[in-house]
């Protein structure tokens, strides 16, 4: 919950508390807030253990499904496309195509189909164009 608060933010909170509450009431306010946080944490851990007891093995299944949902929420659109539509092959995005050997016969087949004819082919005559 407070994992993102660093020492700098904590120092700012203490200074603001010192200015607002004064030096005589600040220790009591700190004790009260730490006690309230401790009670909230104990309450939440009690609720979690009660849910685990009531639901049994379904609780672990629910936590697994919620974990998968959290992984999907953290995916970027590119990662979602790569995983679900392209089966993890991201060469379309990176440009690293490893199957260059299979592309060369197709190029040769196209080149043989487009060989020059024996006689030159003239475009049809259009009387309106002249």
Swiss-Prot record:
It comes from Mycobacterium ulcerans (strain Agy99). Keywords: Cell membrane, Membrane, Protein transport, Translocation, Transmembrane, Transmembrane helix, Transport. One of its GO terms (molecular function) is protein transmembrane transporter activity. This is Sec-independent protein translocase protein TatB. The chain crosses the membrane at residues 2-22. Residues 108-130 are annotated as: Disordered. Part of the twin-arginine translocation (Tat) system that transports large folded proteins containing a characteristic twin-arginine motif in their signal peptide across membranes. Together with TatC, TatB is part of a receptor directly interacting with Tat signal peptides. TatB may form an oligomeric binding site that transiently accommodates folded Tat precursor proteins before their translocation. It is a single-pass membrane protein. Belongs to the TatB family. One of its GO terms (cellular component) is TAT protein transport complex. GO terms for biological process: protein transport by the Tat complex. Its main location: membrane. The keyword Membrane applies. The Tat system comprises two distinct complexes: a TatABC complex, containing multiple copies of TatA, TatB and TatC subunits, and a separate TatA complex, containing only TatA subunits. Substrates initially bind to the TatABC complex, which probably triggers association of the separate TatA complex to form the active translocon. It is found in: Cell membrane. HAMAP family: TatB.
């Amino acid at each position: 919950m407070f994992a993102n608060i660093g020492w700098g933010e904590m120092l700012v909170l203490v200074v603001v508390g010192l200015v607002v509450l004064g030096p005589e009431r600040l220790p009591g306010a700190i004790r009260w807030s730490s006690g309230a946080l401790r009670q909230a944490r104990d309450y939440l851990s009690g609720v979690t253990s009660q849910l685990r007891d009531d639901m049994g093995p379904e609780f672990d299944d629910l936590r697994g499904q919620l974990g998968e949902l959290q992984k999907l929420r953290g995916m970027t659109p590119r990662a979602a496309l790569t995983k679900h539509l392209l089966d993890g092959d991201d060469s379309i995005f990176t440009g690293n195509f490893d199957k260059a050997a299979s592309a060369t016969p197709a190029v040769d087949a196209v080149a043989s189909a487009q060989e020059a004819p024996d006689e030159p082919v003239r475009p049809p005559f259009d009387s309106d164009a002249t």
